Amino acid sequence: MPGGRRGPSRQQLSRSALPSLQTLVGGGCGNGTGLRNRNGSAIGLPVPPITALITPGPVRHCQIPDLPVDGSLLFEFLFFIYLLVALFIQYINIYKTVWWYPYNHPASCTSLNFHLIDYHLAAFITVMLARRLVWALISEATKAGAASMIHYMVLISARLVLLTLCGWVLCWTLVNLFRSHSVLNLLFLGYPFGVYVPLCCFHQDSRAHLLLTDYNYVVQHEAVEESASTVGGLAKSKDFLSLLLESLKEQFNNATPIPTHSCPLSPDLIRNEVECLKADFNHRIKEVLFNSLFSAYYVAFLPLCFVKSTQYYDMRWSCEHLIMVWINAFVMLTTQLLPSKYCDLLHKSAAHLGKWQKLEHGSYSNAPQHIWSENTIWPQGVLVRHSRCLYRAMGPYNVAVPSDVSHARFYFLFHRPLRLLNLLILIEGSVVFYQLYSLLRSEKWNHTLSMALILFCNYYVLFKLLRDRIVLGRAYSYPLNSYELKAN
């Protein structure tokens, strides 16, 4: 009616008359603002925090069976045998002969040109490849303990003899290599250690190292701050020699024990657990990468550096063998250092951490939004603002920092417990199928022999991966109600 007062439209009614979810769950606790009228003034309503009205459901974990894992000594022995077989195959690829020719050719009397092989180099490579096995023997003997003084003296003597023998062989081979080769070739002998020290030992996370010494993770926030404040002094006190000795010692140490998951209740403790697990995972991956590259370097690349210029060999096949050795060593070390129990631990921690999805500005403008708080456990679907950006909670339990990329990466990698295992099966299965294809297409005797020997080693690794995948796949697909559920 002209001149009369118009009633409010539907849009105005929906915005002013109905309280928003932000008012119902955010309120005056820092998670949102109060109800506002059209003039923008806040109406003071006593509103409880979001955690009092929307409580996320408890995180429930599946119980997986204890799958058999090779012991440290057994794995190092099998890994050493595999590397010796790969080294033998590489020497066949380099020094093979046409031994079926008539005997009037001097080089065709044997299948290999044994007179061209540098046995000092082969002995040096063998000692370098056996370093982990030797240290595993010493560690297992030390763990066994001594029942008597005689037993203790025998253990000490055996350890001394073993280390002395390895050191003597190493020095003897180095002296002979110095006499018969140029300085440029000799630089290749210690190249992996020269690369490892500057890349790895100067980038150690001292705070993570301090926190990882105790694996119960249930620490007070004050202790965390105190340990973080002492990081600077500890990092500065380390000189180059101590870092060098520490980094070299890590190459002989066995894998660190698997930590335990404590289902912490506090968001700070959850994030602290994730930081510790992230540092431990990065350390294990660093060891896997270095040891796999170290093995491939000494097995397949170093023999090529000492080949005489007059010696002909198939460069493509030798480089292909180098890649295969590295991939197989990577899968074997990953399977040993990242077992199914450890991956399940990372999955449980990722379930507590949660994930945030970044949204565009202007989207969800009419939906309730909250200010992110580090002391709040956010349920799924909640919109929060953090660092001038809008995020939506994706997991059922969210305590991650929205702007922290490492938290999002951690959740992406481990919120599905079989992701890493499926990746290893895909890599190893592709290698096995390619080697079978190459075996069927091979026409040279050294190609057939090398593929046949390597395939036997790969079958064992693929069998273990498929066994774990079948068992864990059924365990994780089982209904949660059938387990004895563990909730926080």
From Swiss-Prot:
Glycosylation sites: 31, 39
The protein's name in its UniProt record: Transmembrane protein 39A
Tissue expr: Up-regulated in brain tumor glioblastoma multiforme cells (at protein level).
Stated family: Belongs to the TMEM39 family.
Main location: endoplasmic reticulum
Transmembrane segments: 72-92, 110-130, 154-174, 182-202, 287-307, 319-339, 420-440, 446-466
Keywords annotated in UniProt: Autophagy, Endoplasmic reticulum, Glycoprotein, Membrane, Transmembrane, Transmembrane helix
Protein role: Regulates autophagy by controlling the spatial distribution and levels of the intracellular phosphatidylinositol 4-phosphate (PtdIns(4)P) pools. Modulates (PtdIns(4)P) levels by regulating the ER-to-Golgi trafficking of the phosphatidylinositide phosphatase SACM1L.
Superkingdom field: Eukaryota
Effect of substituting residue 247 to L: In a breast cancer sample; somatic mutation
Entry's localization field: Endoplasmic reticulum membrane
Alphabetical list of PANTHER family matching this protein: FI21814P1, TRANSMEMBRANE PROTEIN 39A
Topological relation to the membrane, as annotated: Multi-pass membrane protein
